[in-house]
């Protein structure tokens, strides 16, 4: 018998054996695609397509324009369902990979079946190839059939297949790739174990181990690196997440949801992972002992590494749990030791199936305890120097600073952009704006503020980790301000809302003896743009008095203001409207672009020359709103432009505001 005929004969027998899997898949895909499409279409019609029409019901006018809109929204509904980025296939693909992978090689966990299959005059490689390929074909054919059924259903709703064929085929391709990566992982888990339940547990470990470890490390960094203003080691977290097929799948879908596209290197990485998984599975299958069936693990050499990794991860998790309960060193160490002991004993029971052998690997256990304790202490005492880190001045190209005394009075930067023929508003947080726009080159000022932050961070670590949080400790450290009847009220330095105000300083206490009366603490985010292209960030709580001189210099800098205030992003040639508001009322507004441009120029020039001393002496009483052409287009699209232009103007505006404008110009 030729290899080809033998392959197809074995394939036919295997498909008969797995007919229940095929039936289960058909049921799942039928409800996930054709039935789901019918439900989506009916819900859209019942809500008058409000979900696709800016949450505004689409009124049935019977006009060609209305019918065109309905068809557009129906097409969008179909595209959303079949495109890559829909999260529904995630559940389908992962579940199918586990069921198909486990069912295809379940015989390896039964000694009688192993003896039978391996007694056949068929090479192991041929058996592996048949069962492996069948697992991919079962899913791919079922998926494709139901996409064809969905195409027919969409056509019945009037949606042309040409409108969604491209996104549908690409979604099919990408989901199939992630299915195959997950499927290869399940097969490897089946090959490495001798019992089906252990194989399923191994599958869970392979799916979750690296993302969980990444999340735990991030959690430790979040707790013990008190100056972190972003994920301290995001590259490590992303790398660990992508080492799991499910984690990589979820991250890819999240990227699509965030507006990113699939890159060629992502597809190439998936193809490499699929090939590597298939080869690894084949090698394990060839070397797997026949007597491995019925044992927990098929390969003795893999037992220790897997046990050590799981035990350490368990210790990290329980250590973090107990730390969150008490925030004490002894409880963190207790959680680490207990977690390691429990995990070690549970795994030994799974491995050995004998309670007498719970501590049969004492040296490994002691090594894990020592490693876990050292891991915890390294974060608790910051052996990495994270909170003390300041780059060498020669390695810094530029820097950004965000101080709460300025940031607290800024709104998020809103700007309108056109997407798919429609205007939408994007919002940028203040910290993101500073991180991406500020380019400070005065390193003396930046490092002076950073060094003050490092000094205070050391004291904050001592307060946070060496003592209980309490009113006395908080008052000593300045972390908590307690209101008292004898408070001196609130001292306002600056005022109003907008970038011309400075801050509200709350000073509390009954007299000069109260340490809280003397100073306030502000938060400072520092971003170092290094010459090697990397960006490093830190966040400090800093005494305002300790950096006041540096802050005076900083605020006088043009680089600081242009990186802090979004108003400098406005271009004079793109303005559509300017509004002056005071005490909640509009005192002046104009659509005269020439006037708006002059107001913007005057405001920008005045803001650049402003100093901290000026702000201490002046109280802003109003705010200017600049509306550019893009935002005006968005307002008109949403039907708000007329409403904005017809806002009542304070009757006193004529005499007062023109004086202000003349003075500014």
Task: Specify the residue positions occupied by each region the protein language model found.
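Helix-loop-helix units of permease transmembrane domains in multi-pass membrane transporters
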Residues: 107-137, 289, 293-294, 450, ...
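Long, hydrophobic alpha-helical segments
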Residues: 84-113, 132
């Amino acid at each position: 018998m030729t290899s080809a005929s033998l392959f197809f004969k074995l394939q036919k027998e295997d498909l008969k054996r797995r007919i229940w899997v095929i039936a289960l898949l058909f049921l799942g895909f039928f409800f996930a695609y054709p039935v789901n499409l019918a439900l989506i279409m009916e819900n859209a019609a019942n809500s008058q397509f409000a979900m696709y029409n800016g949450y505004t019901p689409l009124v049935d006018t019977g006009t060609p324009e209305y019918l065109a809109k309905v068809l557009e929204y129906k097409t969008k509904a179909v595209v959303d369902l079949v495109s890559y980025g829909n999260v529904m296939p995630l559940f389908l693909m992962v579940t199918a990979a586990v069921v198909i992978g486990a069912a295809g090689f379940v015989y390896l966990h039964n000694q009688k079946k192993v003896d039978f299959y391996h007694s056949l005059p068929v090479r192991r490689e041929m058996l592996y190839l048949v069962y492996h390929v069948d697992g991919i074909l079962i899913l791919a054919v079922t998926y494709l059939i139901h996409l064809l059924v969905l195409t027919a259903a969409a056509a019945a709703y009037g949606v042309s297949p040409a409108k969604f064929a491209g996104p549908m085929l690409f979604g099919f391709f990408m989901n199939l790739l992630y299915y195959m990566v997950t499927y290869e992982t399940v097969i490897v888990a089946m090959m490495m174990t001798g019992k089906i339940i252990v194989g399923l547990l191994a599958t869970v470990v392979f799916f979750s181990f690296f993302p969980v470890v990444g999340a735990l490390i991030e959690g430790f960094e979040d707790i013990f690196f008190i100056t972190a203003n972003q994920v301290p080691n995001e590259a490590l977290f992303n790398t660990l997440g992508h080492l799991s097929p499910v984690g990589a799948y979820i991250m890819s879908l999240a990227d699509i949801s965030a507006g990113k596209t699939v890159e060629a290197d992502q597809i190439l990485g998936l193809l490499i992972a699929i090939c590597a998984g298939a080869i690894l599975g084949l090698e394990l299958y060839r070397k797997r002992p026949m007597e491995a069936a019925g044992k927990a693990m098929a390969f003795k050499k893999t037992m220790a590494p897997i046990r050590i990794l799981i035990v350490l991860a368990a210790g990290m998790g329980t250590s973090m749990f107990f730390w969150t309960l008490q925030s004490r060193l002894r409880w963190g160490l207790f959680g680490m030791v207990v977690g390691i002991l429990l995990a070690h004993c549970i795994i030994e029971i799974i491995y050995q199936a004998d309670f007498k052998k719970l501590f049969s690997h004492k040296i490994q256990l002691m090594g894990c305890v020592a490693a876990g304790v050292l891991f915890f202490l390294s974060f608790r005492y910051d052996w990495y120097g994270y909170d003390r880190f300041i780059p060498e001045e020669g390695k810094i190209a530029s820097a950004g600073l965000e101080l709460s005394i300025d940031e607290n009075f800024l709104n998020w930067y809103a700007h309108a952009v056109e997407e798919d023929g429609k205007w939408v508003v994007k919002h940028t947080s203040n910290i993101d704006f500073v991180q991406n726009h500020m380019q400070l080159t005065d390193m003396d000022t930046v490092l002076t503020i950073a060094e003050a932050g490092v000094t205070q961070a050391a004291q904050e670590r001592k307060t946070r980790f060496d003592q209980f949080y309490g009113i006395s400790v908080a008052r000593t450290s300045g972390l908590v301000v307690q209101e008292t009847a004898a408070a001196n009220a609130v001292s306002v330095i600056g005022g109003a809302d907008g970038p011309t105000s400075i801050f509200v300083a709350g000073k509390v206490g009954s007299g000069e003896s109260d340490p809280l009366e003397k100073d306030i603490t502000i938060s400072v985010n520092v971003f170092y743009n290094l010459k090697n292209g990397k960006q490093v960030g830190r966040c400090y709580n800093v005494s305002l008095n300790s950096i006041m001189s540096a802050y005076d210099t900083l605020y006088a800098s043009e680089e600081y203001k242009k990186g802090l205030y979004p108003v400098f992003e406005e271009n004079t040639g793109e303005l559509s409207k300017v509004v002056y508001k005071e005490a909640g009322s509009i005192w002046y507004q104009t659509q005269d672009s020439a006037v708006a441009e002059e107001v913007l120029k005057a405001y920008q020039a005045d803001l650049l020359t402003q100093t901290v001393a000026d702000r201490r002496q002046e109280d802003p009483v109003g705010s200017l709103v600049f509306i550019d052409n893009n935002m005006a287009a968005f307002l008109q699209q949403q039907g708000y432009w007329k409403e904005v232009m017809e806002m009542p103007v304070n009757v006193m505006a004529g005499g007062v505001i023109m004086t202000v404008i003349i003075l500014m110009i």
